[in-house]
């Protein structure tokens, strides 16, 4: 099962977790479902272009993380998902795709910096108790996702041939 499928299939449960654990903000948390169709499209994109799909997953994840950080606020821990996006960038590309990989890494980092400095107030006013619960939920979700990514890519070696750039 691809990472995109795992993300897409888990997204509908997030508002349920918010409802069960927090009680408030369920309607606001439905916004977390917006990117689900895009995550569902990534395996189909892969049929036409594996590079496009390998680019799409961390980039869509990054933009989804940015939106959810605006929705929930940085104190909710949603920014932790940037780490999963960067991990995807680190493991998803082949040796000949290093410039795509570098561009994706810079994109994830720039969006992260933007989220830390210029996001403003969250779209929903969460209490400090709610944010504490969301932080725990999101920390567990990120740990689970990064573990799944590591297990998925375990043992995959991307062939590298030294070139002039590597010898500098």
Where are these regions (language model features)?
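Alpha-helical transmembrane segments and their interfaces in multipass membrane proteins
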Residues: 12-34, 95-156
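Charged/polar, solvent-exposed surface patches and flexible loops
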Residues: 70, 91, 159
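Transmembrane helix boundary and interhelical junction motifs in multipass membrane proteins
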Residues: 77-81
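Heptad-repeat alpha-helical coiled-coil signal-transmission segments
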Residues: 150, 154-168
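Hydrophobic transmembrane alpha-helices and their membrane-interface boundaries in multi-pass
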Residues: 2-73, 83-88, 105-108
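Interfacial segments of multi-pass membrane proteins
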Residues: 89-95
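Acidic-enriched, low-complexity/disordered segments with a strong bias for Aspartate over Glutamate
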Residues: 24, 64, 75, 129-130, ...
């Amino acid at each position: 099962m691809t990472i995109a499928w795992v993300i897409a299939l888990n997204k509908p449960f997030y508002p349920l977790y918010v409802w069960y654990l927090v009680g408030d903000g369920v309607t606001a948390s439905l916004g977390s479902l917006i990117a689900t169709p895009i995550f569902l499209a990534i395996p189909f994109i892969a049929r036409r272009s594996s590079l496009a799909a390998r680019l799409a997953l961390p980039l869509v994840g990054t933009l989804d993380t940015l939106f959810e950080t605006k929705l929930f606020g940085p104190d909710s821990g949603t920014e932790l998902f940037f780490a999963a996006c960067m991990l995807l960038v680190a493991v998803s590309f082949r040796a000949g795709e290093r410039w795509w990989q570098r561009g994706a890494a810079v994109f994830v980092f720039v969006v992260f910096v933007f989220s830390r400095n210029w996001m403003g107030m969250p779209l929903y006013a969460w209490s400090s108790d709610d944010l504490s619960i969301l932080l725990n939920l999101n920390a567990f979700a990120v740990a689970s996702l990064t573990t799944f990514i590591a297990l998925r890519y375990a043992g995959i070696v991307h062939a590298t041939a030294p070139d002039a750039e590597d010898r500098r």
